[in-house]
Amino acid sequence: MIQLPSLTHIGGDFNVYGNLSIDEGSVPNLEVIKGDFILAHSGFRNLPSKLNFIGGRVIISPSDDPGLIKQIREADAAGKILGGVHFCD
């Protein structure tokens, strides 16, 4: 598994599409993604616990973990996702 414990901010897109070797435990201190967060078909089952801002879109698959989809919808409703939620397939 990829481990990036010091990563707190991403100044652009965070694309982990199809990458099963990265999950929410890989980026435990991630707070901000200024661009798109593309996490469809990845190892994510939850949003990173400290993530509080996504400046772009969240792109996910309807076949991804239902709990993750619920968390994303809640974050969107709370205004944490500026670009909205988009399904890729």
Where are these regions (language model features)?
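Concave beta-strand-loop units of leucine-rich repeat
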Residues: M1-Q3, H9-N46, K50-I69, D76-D89
